[in-house]
């Protein structure tokens, strides 16, 4: 049989134009009854990126250097999880500091007069890649706006093998009114470098997720640094006014559209032309 008589086994998906609107794996096409080679290889590559993001060591030195260049101090601590293997199997240990870190933080806090308004914590979480890519540019925007509010800031506390709740202990030891932790989120197949922000009013050991506000997917392909800082500042202002955070504090920040229209809130799906 000549090749010219063979039917074309490759078929494109009619949803192909929608791929420009989302990184989701849609409209991949097919070859016979299978995926084409390119989408299959892309999937395997994305899976490898996600696995690597979980096990990539936390390069805290580069973040500390970047902070020093901006005149900001940092403090390196470690959770009670001794290494990555323990961290992944014992989430509870990632939520608390080890004894040496507790002593160091107490000594540091003893030098403060009064109360810190905002404790800033950075932890590797499940994606050190996210923290290394996005921490410095995001903090530049956040700290500029926080200082404009007249709030006092702690040194940036860098935590190895840390989970979200470790910020509660840090905030309590620093006697901070508020805490925010920047942490690498669990990698997905389209987002190995997604940064999460968790904000807490009156942080203290023992709080549950119900007392925290989360802003997720901070990255170039997701929520921009400026928009994330805008939403976080709104939550912090409201927390100071209402003395609470978590499920009782909703993000109702006004958002300026890309076209420069008037600020709007609510569900964009319900907006009319």
From Swiss-Prot:
Positions bound to adenosylcob(III)alamin: 164, 185, 214
Cofactor remark from the record: Binds between the large and small subunits.
Gene for this chain: eutC
Keyword Ribonucleoprotein: no
The protein's name in its UniProt record: Ethanolamine ammonia-lyase small subunit
NCBIfam families: PRK05465.1
One GO-annotated biological process of the protein: ethanolamine catabolic process
GO terms under cellular component: ethanolamine ammonia-lyase complex; ethanolamine degradation polyhedral organelle
Listed GO MF terms: cobalamin binding; ethanolamine ammonia-lyase activity
Cofactor needs: adenosylcob(III)alamin
Pfam families: EutC
Annotated function: Catalyzes the deamination of various vicinal amino-alcohols to oxo compounds. Allows this organism to utilize ethanolamine as the sole source of nitrogen and carbon in the presence of external vitamin B12.
UniProtKB keywords: Bacterial microcompartment, Cobalamin, Cobalt, Lyase
